[in-house]
């Protein structure tokens, strides 16, 4: 058979399988047909060999926070191939490998195809929901009745909206409608993503956001756990440029495991989990003692003589700073004692190595960039690791410098819809003033996003609030694009919490672990192929805004999560007498050209995107970047690009209390003082309540906090290293066959297996060999998988990739759907702990485990 015939046969069989499969009717639901996808893998330069002529259509991948602009090759109504959008100024046609898995996502025969209703009133992991199909009208009628009942009872605050991954049209469903109903409980996933990562940049240079790294011009890259070519932000761009960067920059990766980026680096330092700040602080110490800090940015001694000597204090008046604040205070309070020898005792890293790295960074300055990652900072005391590592970017002058790092470029994109307070009645106005269910802002949970007490979300703690009914119970919940039972530490807490919610509706593409506890399932259109939306991304010195648009006809009776569903729900609420959301939608979210509201939910989905993006194409956006002539041009190109970032743009006007890069953070001092005053305690009492070790001025400077460990070392001798796969689309590729077939693209992993990786030294110690069935146990849970002996993991640790261990989601994700997991979920082992200053969940550094053969 010819290749082109094989391709078309595969496509026809795929169509047949997806049309013939059935929806789930509980655990025993029929899951027949395995799709054949030869057509997806084939190259497509000769479209005439197919049945028709194809075209590339622009969209955006929402599968991770890279938010890459894409083009979908569509022929005969089928999506066949994905590539980077060549109009992107960030990554061009480059893409990460997981883009291809999206094809298996959209054509997944196990996708939820129609609304479903629970018929088993009992909730629990061991309870078959016995879902049965219902109409959209019935599903939304049930949800609307529950919301109306809360308002009639004057308890609208007992409604909660839970958000997972989102696009920029989320504001209506996430915030506006939640507040109009009368609830403060719009709970995002952010604190299980990377909130602790933002603490260093914000409290040192005022950027509450993620940085872009000028790897094209870098001369030294120091990465604390970041894996740019596999799982860090903007993987497409870094995958394209990393090889060239290795030619002109020295790359050092600090990570307990040999990541994809570490495997290509000039030096890999397999550090003990939780000790990253030790190395960072020792490097800073050497930089000052050796006089290799970047003086044009930082400043110098007035007399020109270096007075930094290990263990000796320095007069503040002797040093004149330029664009920084508090260097000498930092030295005197802590840094003078953080010698390479001190660091070596803790980390085992040779002092000569530390000295060499510091000198190399000084020689390369200011074309120096220091990366942090989830692994280094999403720990129980991770704020200070984030601050300590980021301080090096200031010390070596990489901030806003060529070859360094800088924040995102300014764009005119709107990210919110008009204010809705005028539409709030007395019931809503009273309800939104209630404490949030995640308990943010309490003494023990500062969550200091952007310097505000309670300014950040504490996603995982919402489960504790719900299950303990503290500060109150949640009776009605709407959730979308999330699976917190699987993605949160100690996810079994969510099983308990959701079992207590009277009514929950879940918007989802697949029946997940979270869905298992739902009363109504609402099938979502796929974000990349069937949705209208808009996203942005940064990299390569520019910001891009890219569109999501339907490239194929939606396969089943699905609706778009952030537009069509809230529109339909608002109309249903209005029919029942509560018309505030409906009036707001039709009076405020109108077409930017005609001024008219949408005629139906399908038109509204596009209108929402037109509204937010109008400043790009309706107005002259050339002040910020590209000039677009029309909406149609934006849709066709799919991308708007900003002008290049202006180097040194923030020097002298950082958004900190001093307008300087703060080694002594007056910004953090102010935030902590505000939180302390709120609770009528001292800052030291705040630090104690939040389980940090710093007292006094130490709390405001980069310093070492001993890593928190959970579990007795004698019983649990190994430290867990939770890692992310380059094939993960945040856990949502688990029902893609290719995810397992190509699993060995992750260093040390094995195709079609779920393995935990042990150093051969530990393998010998615990009597393990490759392929052994093992049980890994922590103080809070256990999992089973297979052992893999591998030199790419530090002795004393066990590295395991997050992503497997589903007991729901579909036929490939689970061993037996609804019953038996395929492999093990890392989060079953990870105790519910927090970096309390940021509100971030701690996934790393603290979990001790033991291993035994099964």
UniProtKB/Swiss-Prot annotation:
Record PTM: Predicted to be exported by the Tat system. The position of the signal peptide cleavage has not been experimentally proven.
Binding site for Mo-bis(molybdopterin guanine dinucleotide): 193
Gene3D superfamilies listed in its UniProt record: 2.40.40.20, 3.40.50.740, ADC-like domains, Dimethylsulfoxide Reductase, domain 2
Physiological role: Component of the arsenate respiratory reductase (Arr) complex, which catalyzes the reduction of arsenate (As(V)) to arsenite (As(III)). ArrA is the arsenate-binding subunit. The periplasmic localization of this complex may allow the cell to couple arsenate reduction to energy production before arsenate can be transported to the cell cytoplasm and enter the ars detoxification pathway, an energy-requiring process.
Coiled coil regions, renumbered to chain: none
GO molecular function terms noted in the UniProt entry: 4 iron, 4 sulfur cluster binding; metal ion binding; molybdopterin cofactor binding; oxidoreductase activity
Keywords: 4Fe-4S, Iron, Iron-sulfur, Metal-binding, Molybdenum, Oxidoreductase, Periplasm, Signal
Name of this protein: Arsenate respiratory reductase molybdopterin-containing subunit ArrA
Cofactor note: Binds 1 [4Fe-4S] cluster. Binds 1 molybdenum-bis(molybdopterin guanine dinucleotide) (Mo-bis-MGD) cofactor per subunit.
Gene: arrA
Catalytic activity: arsenite + A + H2O = arsenate + AH2 + H(+)
Induction line: The arrA-arrB operon is induced under anaerobic conditions in the presence of nanomolar concentrations of arsenite or low micromolar concentrations of arsenate. Expression is repressed under aerobic conditions and in the presence of nitrate. The peak of expression occurs during the exponential phase of growth.
Binding site for arsenate: 166, 190, 198
GO CC field: periplasmic space
């Amino acid at each position: 058979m010819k290749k082109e015939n094989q391709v078309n046969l595969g496509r026809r069989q795929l169509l047949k399988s997806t049309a013939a499969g059935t929806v789930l009717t509980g655990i025993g639901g029929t899951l027949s047909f395995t799709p054949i996808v030869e057509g997806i893998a084939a190259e497509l330069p000769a479209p005439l060999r197919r049945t028709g002529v194809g075209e590339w259509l622009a969209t955006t991948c929402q599968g991770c926070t890279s938010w890459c602009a894409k083009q979908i090759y569509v022929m005969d109504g089928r999506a066949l191939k994905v590539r980077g959008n060549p109009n992107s100024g960030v990554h061009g046609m480059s893409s990460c490998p997981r883009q291809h898995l999206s094809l298996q996502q959209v054509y997944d025969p196990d996708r939820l195809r129609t609304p479903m209703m629970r018929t088993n009133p009992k909730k629990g992991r061991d309870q078959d929901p016995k879902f049965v199909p219902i109409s959209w009208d019935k599903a939304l009628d049930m949800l609307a009745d529950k919301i109306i009942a809360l308002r009639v009872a004057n308890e609208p605050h007992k409604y909660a909206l839970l958000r997972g991954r989102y696009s920029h049209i989320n504001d209506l469903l996430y915030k506006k409608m939640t507040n109009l109903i009368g609830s403060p409980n719009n709970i995002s996933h952010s604190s299980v993503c990377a909130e602790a990562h933002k603490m260093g940049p914000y409290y040192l240079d005022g950027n509450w956001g993620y940085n872009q790294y000028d790897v094209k011009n870098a001369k030294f890259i120091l990465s604390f756990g970041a894996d740019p070519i596999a799982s860090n932000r903007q993987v497409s761009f870094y995958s394209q440029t990393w090889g060239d960067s290795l030619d002109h920059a020295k790359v050092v990766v600090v990570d307990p495991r040999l990541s994809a980026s570490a495997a290509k680096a000039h030096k890999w330092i397999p550090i003990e989990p939780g000790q990253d700040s030790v190395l960072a602080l020792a490097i800073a110490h050497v930089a000052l003692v050796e006089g290799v800090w970047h003086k044009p940015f930082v400043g110098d001694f007035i007399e020109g003589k270096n007075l930094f000597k290990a263990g000796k204090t320095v007069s503040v008046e002797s040093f004149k700073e330029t664009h920084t604040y508090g260097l000498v205070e930092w030295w005197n309070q802590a840094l003078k004692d953080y010698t390479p020898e001190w660091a070596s005792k803790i980390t085992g890293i040779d002092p000569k190595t530390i000295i060499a790295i510091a000198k190399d960074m000084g020689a390369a300055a200011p074309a120096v960039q220091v990366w942090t990652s989830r692994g280094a900072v999403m720990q129980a005391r991770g704020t200070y690791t984030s601050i300590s590592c980021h301080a090096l970017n200031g010390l070596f002058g990489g901030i806003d410098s060529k070859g360094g790092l800088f924040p995102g470029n300014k764009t005119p994109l709107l990210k919110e819809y008009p204010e809705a307070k005028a539409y709030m009645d007395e019931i809503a106005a009273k309800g939104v003033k209630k404490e949030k269910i995640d308990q943010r802002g309490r003494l023990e949970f500062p969550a200091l996003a952007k310097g505000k007490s309670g300014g950040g979300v504490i996603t995982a703690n919402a489960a504790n609030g719900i299950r303990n009914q503290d500060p109150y119970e949640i009776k009605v919940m709407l959730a979308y694009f999330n699976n917190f039972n699987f993605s949160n530490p100690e996810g079994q807490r969510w099983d308990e919490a959701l079992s207590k919610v009277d009514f929950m509706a879940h918007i989802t593409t697949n029946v997940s672990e979270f869905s298992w506890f739902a009363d109504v399932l609402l099938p979502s259109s796929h974000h990349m192929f069937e949705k209208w939306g808009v996203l942005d991304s940064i990299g390569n010195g520019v910001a891009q805004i890219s569109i999501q648009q339907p490239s194929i006809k939606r396969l089943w009776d699905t609706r778009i999560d952030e537009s069509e569903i809230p529109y339909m729900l608002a109309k249903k609420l209005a029919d029942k007498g509560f018309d505030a959301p409906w009036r707001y939608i039709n009076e405020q979210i109108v077409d930017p050209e005609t001024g008219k509201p949408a005629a139906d939910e399908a038109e509204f989905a596009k209108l929402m995107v037109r509204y937010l993006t109008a400043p790009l194409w309706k107005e002259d956006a050339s002040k910020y970047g590209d000039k677009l002539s029309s909406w149609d041009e934006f849709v066709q190109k799919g991308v708007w690009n900003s002008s290049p970032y202006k180097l040194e743009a923030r020097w002298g006007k950082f958004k900190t209390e001093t307008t300087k890069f703060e080694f002594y953070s007056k910004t953090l001092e102010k935030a902590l003082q505000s939180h302390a005053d709120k609770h009528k305690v001292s800052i030291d009492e705040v630090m104690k309540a939040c389980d940090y070790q710093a007292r006094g001025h130490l709390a405001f400077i980069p310093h070492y906090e001993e890593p928190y460990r959970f579990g007795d070392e004698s019983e649990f001798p190994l430290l867990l290293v939770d890692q992310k796969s380059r094939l993960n689309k945040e856990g949502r590729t688990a029902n893609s066959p290719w995810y397992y077939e190509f699993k060995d693209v992750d260093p040390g992993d094995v195709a079609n297996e779920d393995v935990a990786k042990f150093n051969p030294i530990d393998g010998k110690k615990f009597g393990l060999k490759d392929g052994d069935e093992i049980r890994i146990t922590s103080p809070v849970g256990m999992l089973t998988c297979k052992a893999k002996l591998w030199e790419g993991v530090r002795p004393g640790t066990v590295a395991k990739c997050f992503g497997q261990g589903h007991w729901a989601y579909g036929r490939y994700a689970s061993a037996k759907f609804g019953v038996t997991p395929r492999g093990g979920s890392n989060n079953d082992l990870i105790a519910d702990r927090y970096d309390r200053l940021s509100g971030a969940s701690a996934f790393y550094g603290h979990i001790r485990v033991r291993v035994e053969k099964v």
